[in-house]
Swiss-Prot record:
Signal peptide: none
The species this protein was found in: Cabbage leaf curl virus (isolate Jamaica) (CaLCuV)
Organism placement in taxonomy: Viruses, Monodnaviria, Shotokuvirae, Cressdnaviricota, Repensiviricetes
Complex formation: Homooligomer. Interacts with the replication-associated protein (REP). Interacts with host proliferating cell nuclear antigen (PCNA). Interacts with host retinoblastoma-related protein 1 (RBR1), and may thereby deregulate the host cell cycle. Oligomerization and interaction with PCNA are necessary for optimal replication enhancement.
Sorted UniProt keywords: Host-virus interaction
Family designation: Belongs to the geminiviridae replication enhancer protein family.
Name the UniProt record assigns to this protein: Replication enhancer protein
Function recorded in the entry: Increases viral DNA accumulation. Enhances infectivity and symptom expression.
UniProt keyword rRNA processing, yes or no: no
Keyword Transcription regulation tagged: no
GO biological process: viral process
Amino acid sequence: MDSRTGESITVAQAENSVFIWEVPNPLYFRIQRVEDPLYTRTRIYHIQVRFNHNLRKALDLRKAYFNFQVWTTSMRASGPTYLSRFKCLVMSHLDNLGVIGINHVIRAVRFATDRSYVTHVHENHVINFKIY
């Protein structure tokens, strides 16, 4: 759903994509925080994936943020370590596809979190399309 207008995203908008080699550094990964709930063997990583300016321009987007909560049973990886592993898996999946768009990023994150140590993944997004 477009966060600004409240309209649903169409299939054409969600599947709109660009070749990955046309856009340098298409995604920006940021770890917001790492939570260790008390009395559990769980670690929660809050990761934000943003489309960079060139990718937003190519896809006619004003803003595109994807916020993920990744619940894991892996207690060894620190925030930056998990982020680099997550980024490597997402980018390798997108490189194999050869294209990048909204749905492709979501599928790449699903690929990156399809591991035995990941128990839950919650997704929230902020997407604004250019309407002018």
